[in-house]
Design a protein with these regions (language model features):
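Beta-strand-centric surfaces of beta-sandwich/beta-rich domains
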Residues: 2-110, 117-245
Length: 245
C-alpha cells in the first residue's frame, strides 16, 4: 500500500502520533494492548484475558499446539505474534484442523497476541503447550486475543502513555475494582509501578511516558473488592527500536 508523504513535506504540521501510526517514523510503532475478562473476582489480581485465572508465563521456549473447540473450524488461519528464547520477535501462521492439535514449527517463549487472518472461527481457539497450559485464547466472535499481557521484545523499549480500566460495577453496589500494573524483569524481579482503586472507569494520560525496558513482562491486572466484575483494560504507547552503533 502506497502512503502519501508526511504533511511536513509541504510545510504543514502533522501529529507525531499519526506519523507513527502511518509507519513513517523509522524504528517506531504503535503499541496497543487491550484485555477483557468476563469475571474478575476478589480472589487475586489477574490480567484481563479470556480465562478467569492467573496468567503464568512459560518457563522455557516450546512449540505450541493450536486447536478449536469446534470440529468445523478447518479453514481458519491465525497469526501468532510472540518471542523466542532470546526475546526476539517471531511470528507464525497456523491453519486450524478443528479440534485436532496443530503444532507450531517454532518454539515460543512468549505470546503477545494471536489474530485471525483467514476465515471466522465458530469455536474458541486455544494456543497451549504440550502439557495443556493455555497461553493465548480467542473467544468466540472476537477474532483476536483480548489479553492485557505483553512482553517487550529484545532490542526495543516501550514508552507507555495511557492506561484505561473499565468495570461493570454500579455506584450503589458498594463493590469497586483495583487496577495495577505489574512488571517482571528477565531476572524475575517484580515491580508494581501503578495501583489505584476505581468504580466504573479509570484513565490516566502521562505527559512523560512510563519507560519499560526490553525483555520485561507486563501484566495489567484488576481485582474486585467483592463480586465478580466484567473488566476491560486498554494500554497505549509507542514501541521504539533501541539505537545501535
Amino acid at each position: 500500500m502506497n502512503l502519501y508523504a508526511s504533511q511536513t513535506q509541504y510545510g504543514k504540521n502533522e501529529e507525531f502520533s499519526l506519523e507513527v501510526a502511518r509507519g513513517l517514523v523509522p524504528g517506531h510503532e504503535v503499541l496497543n494492548v487491550f484485555g477483557y475478562s468476563t469475571s474478575v473476582t476478589n480472589a487475586a489480581f489477574i490480567p484481563a484475558w479470556e480465562n478467569t485465572a492467573a496468567y503464568v508465563f512459560p518457563t522455557v521456549a516450546s512449540t505450541m499446539v493450536v486447536s478449536s473447540s469446534s470440529a468445523s473450524d478447518t479453514a481458519v488461519t491465525v497469526l501468532i505474534d510472540g518471542l523466542n528464547a532470546s526475546y526476539s520477535r517471531i511470528t507464525e501462521s497456523v491453519t486450524l484442523d478443528g479440534t485436532t492439535d496443530v503444532a507450531t514449527a517454532q518454539a515460543f517463549f512468549r505470546i503477545n497476541s494471536v489474530i485471525t487472518t483467514a476465515g471466522n472461527a465458530v469455536g474458541t481457539i486455544y494456543v497451549k503447550n504440550a502439557g495443556g497450559t493455555t497461553y493465548a485464547q480467542i473467544a468466540i466472535g472476537s477474532g483476536k486475543t483480548n489479553m492485557s499481557v505483553y512482553t517487550v521484545p529484545a532490542g526495543y523499549t516501550a514508552y507507555l502513555t495511557q492506561f484505561d480500566a473499565f468495570s461493570s460495577t454500579s455506584v450503589t453496589s458498594g463493590v469497586y475494582a483495583t487496577f495495577r500494573a505489574l512488571r517482571t524483569s528477565s531476572t524475575g524481579v517484580n515491580n508494581v509501578v501503578l495501583q489505584v482503586p476505581f468504580l466504573n472507569d479509570y484513565s490516566i494520560t502521562r505527559p512523560y511516558p512510563l519507560i519499560v525496558p526490553e525483555k520485561t513482562d507486563n501484566q495489567w491486572q484488576c481485582k474486585s473488592s467483592g463480586a465478580g466484575l466484567g473488566i476491560g483494560i486498554v494500554v497505549l504507547g509507542v514501541l521504539v527500536k533501541n539505537y545501535q552503533d
